[in-house]
Amino acid sequence: DASALVTMTAGQGDAFEILPDRISKEPMAPAVRRADESLLAIVRWTIYAVIEAEEIGITAATINEPVPGRRAIADLFDLPAASALGLSNDWAYRTIKAVGNYGEIYDRNLAGPAMPRMQRGLNENWTRGGLMYAPPLR
C-alpha cells in the first residue's frame, strides 16, 4: 500500500522514489470492535460528514462563514437524527470545526508537508476523480 511505503521512507529525503504506478488496490476503512453497531454508525456518519464538508468546500476555518445562495453552514450540519446515535444535533458541525473536512484530515496525516510524496488518488473526492462521496446526511 502506498501509504505504508510513504510512511516507511519518511525522513529519508530522496533516498527512495515511490513510483506512481499502482499494481494493487487495498480498500481500507475504519474498524470498530465486533458487535458495537452504535460506534460503527457513529464512525461511519462522522466520515460521511467530513467527506460532505470537503465536497461543498467547508473547512475548519470557514465553517462559520456564510455561503451565498445556501442556508447557513451550521444548519447544514444540524442533524436531529443524530439523537438516534446518542449524539447532539451539532455533532457534525463540531467535528468539522475541530478537525476539518476529509481533505484537511488526509493532508494533515498522510500528505502535505509531512509526506509530500503521498498523492490522494482514489482517496480524492468524487468531484475530482476519486471514489470518496457521502450519502445524503438527512
Model-derived features: where do they sit?
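Histidine (H) residue identity feature
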Residues: 1, 93, 106-109, 125
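A ligand-binding cleft/hinge motif common to bilobed small-molecule-binding domains
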Residues: 1-17
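Extended ligand-binding regions for polar small-molecule ligands
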Residues: 20-93, 101, 113, 127-128, ...
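Terminal (typically C-terminal) long, contiguous, charged/leucine-rich segments with helical propensity
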Residues: 100-108, 114-123
